[in-house]
Amino acid sequence: MKIVRIETFPLFHRLEKPYGDANGFKRYRTCYLIRIITESGIDGWGECVDWLPALHVGFTKRIIPFLLGKQAGSRLSLVRTIQKWHQRAASAVSMALTEIAAKAADCSVCELWGGRYREEIPVYASFQSYSDSPQWISRSVSNVEAQLKKGFEQIKVKIGGTSFKEDVRHINALQHTAGSSITMILDANQSYDAAAAFKWERYFSEWTNIGWLEEPLPFDQPQDYAMLRSRLSVPVAGGENMKGPAQYVPLLSQRCLDIIQPDVMHVNGIDEFRDCLQLARYFGVRASAHAYDGSLSRLYALFAQACLPPWSKMKNDHIEPIEWDVMENPFTDLVSLQPSKGMVHIPKGKGIGTEINMEIVNRYKWDGSAY
């Protein structure tokens, strides 16, 4: 299966109203899709995220010339080479070549990987809680209310981007709105030191629905992570920016995390992403993929979760949820899956089992201008 053509689709959307987390406000969303076509006509799609000008030059000047004429079945060696040039671009190539392999074998991605354990995966609604409005708390509450009406039973909201007192006021308002039956995840985006993070423990004794505390500290403080984890009454999660299994090993060896959160687009390809999930199982911790930045990468995270052995024997709580972006973002609909009552059914067709929405691709093509 010789690669004969590669198409690229840089996409851009400027937000109507900025939203954000402890790292600041997002004012736009981007997506970079690729489509690899073989001489037999079999194709596969991939996705990555980064600054669009850098991605586009990287693909057109180096990655595409390198891939043309290569065998699509040589996924591991091709991806390993591209990793040296641009790790996130390598992730897109790995997705596309995985879909080609599945289609060539006349099966789904999950079947290519040995089959799924389950037909549906739980997802949680992921919010960017902060906005540049004095009424940001009420706006956040309204956003959460809207998604709860759609059937989500788990939500993730942001902390660490304003004063501790104001964050507590925000979470109390959400608790009043959502109720204790809704699982709530708190994501600090590495905003605190250990002392500041531990202040939340007082409230965890009151809020019985906290799913986990996400990335409370920078990851250059593993000893503080281990200490904090030992003292908190809720699980500690993190690791969305780790580049592969090797970066998780010291954190897991030191028992820093209860839940690891690899991202398909941040690691060195889909194969290493799956290695991260399996590594968690070997260490006896949970794995819940970070999947905020793309719908195709989220689909691959769902595939991987469907093929992952259960973490527990507890009925209806044996597999970890996957992140689902519910903020303004047209690229969420590039893949036509939608949750129902907080669950997503896994497509069963050949390859990824669904089509990329070309209407969205054509509508949001980046025009090459600065942003």
Swiss-Prot record:
Residues annotated as binding Mg(2+): E214, E240, H290
**EC main group:** isomerase
Keyword list, A-Z: Isomerase, Magnesium, Metal-binding
**Does Nucleotide-binding show up as a keyword for this record?**
no
Could you tell me which Pfam families the record lists for this protein?
MR_MLE_C, MR_MLE_N
EC number(s) per entry: 5.-.-.-
Any one GO molecular-function label of the UniProt entry:
hydro-lyase activity
Q: Active site located where?
A: K158, H290
Q: What InterPro entries does its record include?
A: Enolase-like_C_sf, Enolase-like_N, Enolase_C-like, Mandelate_racemase_C, Mandelate_racemase_N_dom, RHMD-like
Q: Which GO terms describe its biological process?
A: carbohydrate catabolic process
Please give the cofactor(s) recorded in the UniProt entry for this protein. Mg(2+)
Q: Which domain of life is it from?
A: Bacteria
Recorded family membership: Belongs to the mandelate racemase/muconate lactonizing enzyme family.
Q: How does this protein assemble?
A: Homooctamer.
Name of the protein in its database record: Putative isomerase YitF
Origin organism of this chain?
Answer: Bacillus subtilis (strain 168)
Which gene specifies this protein's sequence?
yitF
